[in-house]
Amino acid sequence: MRRQWGALLLGALLCAHGLASSPECACGRSHFTCAVSALGECTCIPAQWQCDGDNDCGDHSDEDGCILPTCSPLDFHCDNGKCIRRSWVCDGDNDCEDDSDEQDCPPRECEEDEFPCQNGYCIRSLWHCDGDNDCGDNSDEQCDMRKCSDKEFRCSDGSCIAEHWYCDGDTDCKDGSDEENCPSAVPAPPCNLEEFQCAYGRCILDIYHCDGDDDCGDWSDESDCSSHQPCRSGEFMCDSGLCINAGWRCDGDADCDDQSDERNCTTSMCTAEQFRCHSGRCVRLSWRCDGEDDCADNSDEENCENTGSPQCALDQFLCWNGRCIGQRKLCNGVNDCGDNSDESPQQNCRPRTGEENCNVNNGGCAQKCQMVRGAVQCTCHTGYRLTEDGHTCQDVNECAEEGYCSQGCTNSEGAFQCWCETGYELRPDRRSCKALGPEPVLLFANRIDIRQVLPHRSEYTLLLNNLENAIALDFHHRRELVFWSDVTLDRILRANLNGSNVEEVVSTGLESPGGLAVDWVHDKLYWTDSGTSRIEVANLDGAHRKVLLWQNLEKPRAIALHPMEGTIYWTDWGNTPRIEASSMDGSGRRIIADTHLFWPNGLTIDYAGRRMYWVDAKHHVIERANLDGSHRKAVISQGLPHPFAITVFEDSLYWTDWHTKSINSANKFTGKNQEIIRNKLHFPMDIHTLHPQRQPAGKNRCGDNNGGCTHLCLPSGQNYTCACPTGFRKISSHACAQSLDKFLLFARRMDIRRISFDTEDLSDDVIPLADVRSAVALDWDSRDDHVYWTDVSTDTISRAKWDGTGQEVVVDTSLESPAGLAIDWVTNKLYWTDAGTDRIEVANTDGSMRTVLIWENLDRPRDIVVEPMGGYMYWTDWGASPKIERAGMDASGRQVIISSNLTWPNGLAIDYGSQRLYWADAGMKTIEFAGLDGSKRKVLIGSQLPHPFGLTLYGERIYWTDWQTKSIQSADRLTGLDRETLQENLENLMDIHVFHRRRPPVSTPCAMENGGCSHLCLRSPNPSGFSCTCPTGINLLSDGKTCSPGMNSFLIFARRIDIRMVSLDIPYFADVVVPINITMKNTIAIGVDPQEGKVYWSDSTLHRISRANLDGSQHEDIITTGLQTTDGLAVDAIGRKVYWTDTGTNRIEVGNLDGSMRKVLVWQNLDSPRAIVLYHEMGFMYWTDWGENAKLERSGMDGSDRAVLINNNLGWPNGLTVDKASSQLLWADAHTERIEAADLNGANRHTLVSPVQHPYGLTLLDSYIYWTDWQTRSIHRADKGTGSNVILVRSNLPGLMDMQAVDRAQPLGFNKCGSRNGGCSHLCLPRPSGFSCACPTGIQLKGDGKTCDPSPETYLLFSSRGSIRRISLDTSDHTDVHVPVPELNNVISLDYDSVDGKVYYTDVFLDVIRRADLNGSNMETVIGRGLKTTDGLAVDWVARNLYWTDTGRNTIEASRLDGSCRKVLINNSLDEPRAIAVFPRKGYLFWTDWGHIAKIERANLDGSERKVLINTDLGWPNGLTLDYDTRRIYWVDAHLDRIESADLNGKLRQVLVSHVSHPFALTQQDRWIYWTDWQTKSIQRVDKYSGRNKETVLANVEGLMDIIVVSPQRQTGTNACGVNNGGCTHLCFARASDFVCACPDEPDSRPCSLVPGLVPPAPRATGMSEKSPVLPNTPPTTLYSSTTRTRTSLEEVEGRCSERDARLGLCARSNDAVPAAPGEGLHISYAIGGLLSILLILVVIAALMLYRHKKSKFTDPGMGNLTYSNPSYRTSTQEVKIEAIPKPAMYNQLCYKKEGGPDHNYTKEKIKIVEGICLLSGDDAEWDDLKQLRSSRGGLLRDHVCMKTDTVSIQASSGSLDDTETEQLLQEEQSECSSVHTAATPERRGSLPDTGWKHERKLSSESQV
């Protein structure tokens, strides 16, 4: 409370300034100026009062720095002159207030779990570096800046934020450093068609635009709206649509976001009960001169009399005139007060005598005595105050002073003691409390996300993002849940505190849930809703929802709970702002505060301090009070532009402010120490302190059994109450009814509500339904408890149980404005009117067997009711001639019964007892009734009916809804009297019904075997009482009971999300959805097979072609791969084929009707082919092409005889059809807006229909053409010969695409291929001259012209993100074919095993290695764990091992092909290994590494003898492949943009191709090198010898990755591991000179041996003679050593063994295995072993000599050898020293992005990321920024190839041949090198083993170098 000062005696002067200005105090010369107060007040005192030991200023500022009289011997003299007890010195407390009593104290020893402060205090070690100044001198917070994690960004102030927040356009660092030095801002992506874009770029659903809610957060979604939702009475609507209290209009304070409430205001609009501030603002008159600055400019406190006594400090005296003086001036003989009250007899002042002296009897003082101006002045010790007698002292009750203790306080004589609640601990200052447990976290809603911030560090993290409009917030610490409300979605949601498992809690019946509170003791959820003016409660999962408080509530906002006391508190900022409380069961409601409140927003409870705090956004203040509302006090009244929410923790307040977009803090007692925790937030909303002590433990009054309650158990004081969900009656003290028997049912557009008649409160609650957007009509069926409703926004009819369960859509097609609904509870039929289509329809109650009853002479039919007893239905029609009609429920006997004095006849109701028909007329403003035949018409209510809409009857009452009064009312159904209002202030009221269980039963013939009807049996007024009817589009047969099986003649069309049919057999046009039970995304092309009754369609979003029966059954996808944009589709019903065009791939393809035997027919010179039609009898197919040069073409149906028919005056030729009868070709052009025709050769061109707005699909049947139009959203018809008589077939059909006309009665015609497929083995395709046989893409046709090879022999296999594809090299058309492997996400690396015919691949999205057959079957995961980024993969087809690189883990691993026996081979000195390749015959393993030091390395297949081959002049070595014939390695460098090669030792290096764009992977076959390129999106090849003859094999392929060749020539040769796994139990690794056995890193159930032995062969399901091109599993004739290799006779697979293998004894000439006799293998091994021992000694000697010779001639000082020892394969400590090549600066900031997605154009100028790190990127950045120039080291250009000639050409420097290692390699390969020219004459021929493909192959000739 601010002190008010008057004109004081002795020149005391008060200078009070407004809160908005900074005071400048100037006192007179004879006065002392006190310190300026926190409220800006100035105080002047007489100068002689300074340093007199008296607190005259009230803040001791007049005594600061004064030298006071000497303290008594029993006291301690502080440095500031203060006297304290000596016993208080060095006790750890700052009693002097300058810490001088704690200086020079002996050091205090702290415990082991304590931290020693520099000031001598001891605090808990846990408090060290927790961001809180616990020591008092901040010595516990002098900490090193904490390190940010790898996924965090460090702000300039040292705080850490999430890395992805860097440069995201949102300031997340407190200093804004995360948004500095960012690249140019990227414009926000546009919103889609169903969204609205806010002013700052955010997208919201379009339905939220102009709905009256601030969904954008800046009101931009509500600006420029033509109309807004009307505000309530007592509210003012801002221009933006916001509703505020009407009293805030022209009150001088801008409450509207656009300040429109203060526009056009007169000079004064204040009432007689208000005071006008200088600013023009109006405040209550009672607030004038109350000591509070309510005007915010202090004008309400100016010129005030002294209306009350200010509160003086504890050591001050209150004068009668209100002045405060120091206690020492009391009874000092001087009139210090000015009114002599300090010297009056009432103060027991005794007369002064001259003998007074402190030396005599201590001057009569009880404690301290001092002489002041010659007189005795008695004073007291600290903790005491001088009594009125001026001599004695009494104890000061410090506990009565707020803020002395943080929580608890106990007073004692001359002292006090602070204490803390459970869960807190007293700090070293002995006054404040610190919470035990984890560091506190501020949890706050930020509209679009929910974040956590550390208040002492200003660091915050994201908890939940991508939210719509999160406002209210709370948490449940024990259950680790966070709850929030979203006022845009009108939902309450929850999630785990780690952000996972988001789920809806309350999803219906909310309008503006602005407050949320969790009862953590009883597990309940409470919330306020200012839209519905309610406070509700439910379980934590939203179950058992109950309206707790609803009466006398206006706009409840904030809510807080005190579960320990069973109390709920809330704020209400309606017309009468207040803060209220009640028990948590809603009882005991009471007002806490209702004065000096404007806009009470946030509310929080200090449980330990037993106080509440709230913010007032309009009053700009933070206040506190006791929990009963007493001791109310303003804590902060300055610097609060718009506080919204508040929380408290320990001694601090934290609040959010909308205006400053910040989180702030201050001391909860004084309001001082204000600090900005976070600013520059998006839109801070609710805030809470996340800490266990904010939810202290309490007694659960309901116990473990919910208090015995069947539903809700709610605390009530210290007891509890059993409560029922809203509407359910209580049947006992603890039990509720399980169902509702009768209730009023009404629609409110966005929800459907009920008012139970089982309870007395008549409060409405929402039926929990999803996606109700604009409900209008209602009805119900009590037999199955269903409620039905129509929705005119979604154009659907739905139903659900009365409790909201079992919700389903029953009719969702061909509805435009279903406004009326009626249930025939007798025959279970659903009737409805549609004002958009002007129809009345009926269906079964589940929506099946729908049919049109009345379609003529209807003009906006509205409501409908049925009377099953008489068999009639009644409806209102409020078109041009308003009327009420009736007809039989089968549409018979139609007649108008009321046609006069009607305007807008709305609701209808039937009184079945009195046989009356009631209706409401909104135009006539009446409710009337008449007999069921229209007679005896009478007005029931004719006044005070502004706009009645819905109408119903129940019992003796009639109920109706009124749009204008926004109410539900009732009256007596016979007299119209006794009117009452059931509910009011309900927006958008629609239909109304009473659900009950007393509908009269009616007998009907339809109940017996459906009346004999095959489909629909309807009630009828005819003598039989019923009639049979057929579903829409189907005719009733002559028997009057049976319907035809289906449509004979019909249109069928695609509408993107569905396929529909329009029957041409009936007299009206009505579309019917083909009930295919799948989700369609973008259905475009369509075709029909009338023979089997199937429809075919393409979906360009799902990339598939599908088919189903015309009744929707038997759906199947026939083409699922290799499609991009299938715009055209045609079914050859005669030839049983399906044809389609693909605009994305620019191809025309054909396949069998089941999708098999797929073939590309046309692929050259196509540019966006679209429509396609067939003429089987003529053998032609026609198609449109609307590319750059639009044209219409024709070819044979086998792709032959291609010709352009028309190529001029075409724009966008869309639809295409053939008129076989008149031999005409017809097409629709959307650009020229014409439908044209020509003959079948393109001649005689003429226009049929013009203009047409945007035609798309075109078809023909009989004498008419039909077309779809995008712009009119309609289907049109015209005469096919003249184009005249254009009519509208169906309208209001958005998304119209292709269309076909079908007459199933027409004969199909003759099949050119006959009954035996023309003798073709695969495809038989018609052509003008007959037919031709064709093969699926990539397979060759044999010489007989009829038979196809079973499969391709040589082909490319490549990966492209989500696909694996094949390109045959056997045929000339290099078109790709998808390998149908399922579940591909992000495939990177590939390899193939020719033995089992399986493809192996890595998927870095799933982090797995998988394999599958080439037909897509038998897909299985080989390695499914422990992978991060598997970039490289290689199959050892001999040893049956699998190798891979892992860039994420920097390892090279191996396993068996089935994933077993997994082992890490190399895990050191690797920095992002990429490609990998194996050479089993030589036992070599090669890989590239493009880390910090790019290199290419080689090792043995077990990882030993590791060697760096190339480490200079490398950038990003990506792909790697081996040429097994020429013994060379090839690689691509994506940084240097070239393809290079070298020999197997890294020598004879040669640049093959320069200036390639961005190569990724490569492979070799025959004389060609093939590679994939990211930038050109293509597969290319060059001659491997010259680097010339560059060709593009395949273009326009997104996301190209790995590529390999599958060929019988690739996986040849063998080694010792090829026979029975080398005798190893687990892993067998071939090496350059021997082989080794190895054990897996994780042992399995089998014992592992490192010594080769006899291992029984594993049984095989398939014989090796059938599949395997390598050695079969047979026991070795010799036991292999792990260090030596024995020459022995092994099996040979003819054609797979080289001469060198044969010379080494690795090949046998017989295909039959020769098993060893018992013991023979051992004897032979002994003999051979002895021989080899001698040879080994000789070899070692020779090797030593060679080594010395080599060393003398060649030394590589930069190369260190890596040695590996069996079995651990640990590397030696010797490091490989390689020259480091620097990477770009941003290289290390990039990560491997695994999510799939489209690749954008890569250009040399724009590629964002280093390709090897992020294989997926769609962003743009400067490519040159990523590359750094690397200096060439001038290496040798070498060319080492095996030539067909007998010479070797080596271009090298003169010193190059001194390399003895290279010379040795050349000599070795002279005997091995085979010619790669397949055209040469073979030296021998032999049969090849079957590799899975049947083939014949010519062997290559051999020549010596």
Curated annotation (Swiss-Prot):
Effect in UniProt of substituting residue 1214 to A: Compromises Wnt-suppressive activity
Glycosylation sites: 264, 498, 719, 901, 1077, 1415, 1467
Nucleotide-binding is among the record's keywords: no
GO BP terms: amyloid-beta clearance by cellular catabolic process; dendrite morphogenesis; dorsal/ventral pattern formation; embryonic digit morphogenesis; endocytosis; enzyme-linked receptor protein signaling pathway; generation of neurons; hair follicle development
Subunit note: Homooligomer. Interacts with MUSK; the heterodimer forms an AGRIN receptor complex that binds AGRIN resulting in activation of MUSK. Interacts (via the extracellular domain) with SOST; the interaction facilitates the inhibition of Wnt signaling. Interacts with MESD; the interaction promotes glycosylation of LRP4 and its cell-surface expression.
Disease entry from the Swiss-Prot or TrEMBL record: Cenani-Lenz syndactyly syndrome: A congenital malformation syndrome defined as complete and complex syndactyly of the hands combined with malformations of the forearm bones and similar manifestations in the lower limbs. It is characterized by fusion and disorganization of metacarpal and phalangeal bones, radius and ulnar shortening, radioulnar synostosis, and severe syndactyly of hands and feet. Sclerosteosis 2: A sclerosing bone dysplasia characterized by a generalized hyperostosis and sclerosis leading to a markedly thickened skull, with mandible, ribs, clavicles and all long bones also being affected. Due to narrowing of the foramina of the cranial nerves, facial nerve palsy, hearing loss and atrophy of the optic nerves can occur. Sclerosteosis is clinically and radiologically very similar to van Buchem disease, mainly differentiated by hand malformations and a large stature in sclerosteosis patients.
Name this protein carries in UniProt: Low-density lipoprotein receptor-related protein 4
Gene name of this polypeptide: LRP4
